């Protein structure tokens, strides 16, 4: 089977535009000569972009592709201007990838919400749904739910009793939310589970006794939760995901975890109960954290790290058990030297 590569396949993505290059430059804060009047119709990678498309370079390893591109305009840093082919307009910015995100969103904005409640949706009469919200097929909205303006609830999603969400939230298909408070612009992708019981039980002579989980989940503004991730509600304190944080697919957050602002949690990370993260913490794929830890702001934890102790702010740690990155790589280098003897 042969499928031609297409950026923004119109079967799936609605394109806006065209836009004059001056409008694109203004959107990213770039300056261009006053006589530039090129009309741009879309975005594409350097290798396949055509004369009416915008591309970008943020990684120098692709500099050769920049020199050969046929794009109409490219978003680059100042130190790459001399490698832009003749006839290609350079949009010079300090952060090309950030500018690229804004330009791509300009050409491919999010689909507008289609206000209304699908006839097959099950909506409790006590739910409060803003008239501008969209409730999809077979969605379930339970008693006392509050859904703000411009929200979209996709097919088969279940919004449990009392859940409250702000404006412009997106809840993916087959997601379930209970015992949760959502801010504005929260994106919950398909299959996510939010607000279920935390993993709490007390041992007894006859087995285990389940501990009631009496907290909530709070997702602050601009949080995104990737597909099939799970966030347990708190036992007595809330589980909190700080504003602007991004959780990848298949992430597990246990009860009472408190995450600061703008954290990045990559796929298959597991954070045990009552662990606290500061702001701008990064956890790479499959990292595991035991409970009741404190991870300082700006800490970076490597892939598959096993974190069993507090991590100071700004630290970089890797390995299992986790240790400072410099120590880890020094040990690896020593082992390699010993192995050659």
Curated annotation (Swiss-Prot):
GO biological process, one term: lipid A biosynthetic process
Record-annotated active site: 255 (proton acceptor)
Pfam family, one: LpxD
MF term (GO), any: N-acyltransferase activity
Gene Ontology cellular-component annotations: membrane
Pathway connected to this protein: Bacterial outer membrane biogenesis; LPS lipid A biosynthesis
Catalytic activity: a UDP-3-O-[(3R)-3-hydroxyacyl]-alpha-D-glucosamine + a (3R)-hydroxyacyl-[ACP] = a UDP-2-N,3-O-bis[(3R)-3-hydroxyacyl]-alpha-D-glucosamine + holo-[ACP] + H(+)
Sequence intervals crossing the membrane: none
Enzyme Commission numbers on file: 2.3.1.191
Keyword set, alphabetical order: Acyltransferase, Lipid A biosynthesis, Lipid biosynthesis, Lipid metabolism, Repeat, Transferase
Biological role: Catalyzes the N-acylation of UDP-3-O-acylglucosamine using 3-hydroxyacyl-ACP as the acyl donor. Is involved in the biosynthesis of lipid A, a phosphorylated glycolipid that anchors the lipopolysaccharide to the outer membrane of the cell.
Record's subunit section: Homotrimer.
PANTHER family with a match to the protein in the record: UDP-3-O-ACYLGLUCOSAMINE N-ACYLTRANSFERASE, UDP-3-O-ACYLGLUCOSAMINE N-ACYLTRANSFERASE 1, MITOCHONDRIAL-RELATED
NCBIfam families, A to Z: lipid_A_lpxD (TIGR01853), PRK00892.1 (NF002060)
Family: Belongs to the transferase hexapeptide repeat family. LpxD subfamily.
Stored HAMAP family: LpxD (MF_00523)
Record-given protein name: UDP-3-O-acylglucosamine N-acyltransferase
Organism of origin: Granulibacter bethesdensis (strain ATCC BAA-1260 / CGDNIH1)
Gene: lpxD
């Amino acid at each position: 089977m042969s499928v031609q590569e297409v950026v923004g396949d119109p079967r799936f993505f609605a394109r806006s535009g065209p836009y004059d290059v001056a409008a694109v430059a203004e959107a990213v804060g770039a300056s261009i000569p006053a006589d530039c009047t090129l009309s741009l119709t879309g975005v594409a990678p350097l290798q396949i972009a055509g004369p009416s498309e915008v591309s970008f370079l943020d990684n120098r390893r692709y500099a050769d592709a920049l020199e050969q591109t046929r794009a109409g305009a490219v978003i680059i840093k100042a130190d790459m201007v001399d490698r832009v082919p003749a006839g290609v307009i350079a949009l010079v910015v300090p952060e090309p990838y950030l500018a690229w995100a804004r330009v791509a969103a300009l050409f491919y904005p999010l689909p507008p919400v289609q206000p209304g409640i699908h006839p097959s949706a099950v909506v409790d009469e006590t739910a409060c749904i803003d008239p501008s919200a969209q409730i999809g097929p077979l969605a379930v909205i339970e008693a006392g739910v509050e859904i703000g303006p411009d929200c979209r609830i996709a097919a088969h999603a279940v919004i449990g009793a009392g859940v409250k969400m702000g404006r412009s939230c997106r809840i993916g298909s087959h997601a379930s939310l209970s015992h949760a408070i959502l801010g504005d612009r929260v994106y919950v992708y398909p299959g996510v589970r939010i607000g279920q019981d935390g993993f709490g039980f007390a041992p007894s002579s006859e087995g285990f006794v389940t501990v009631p989980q009496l907290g909530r989940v709070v997702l602050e503004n601009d949080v995104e939760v990737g597909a099939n991730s799970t966030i347990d509600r708190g036992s007595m304190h809330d589980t909190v995901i700080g504003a602007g944080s991004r959780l990848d697919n298949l992430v597990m957050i246990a009860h009472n975890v408190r995450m600061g602002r703008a954290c990045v949690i990559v796929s298959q990370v597991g954070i045990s109960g009552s662990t606290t993260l500061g702001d701008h913490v990064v956890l790479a794929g499959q990292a595991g954290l035991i409970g009741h830890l404190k991870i300082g702001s700006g800490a970076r934890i490597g892939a598959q790290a096993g974190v069993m102790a507090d991590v100071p702010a700004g630290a970089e740690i890797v390995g299992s058990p986790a240790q400072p990155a410099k120590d880890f790589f020094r040990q690896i280098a020593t082992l390699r030297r010993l192995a050659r003897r």
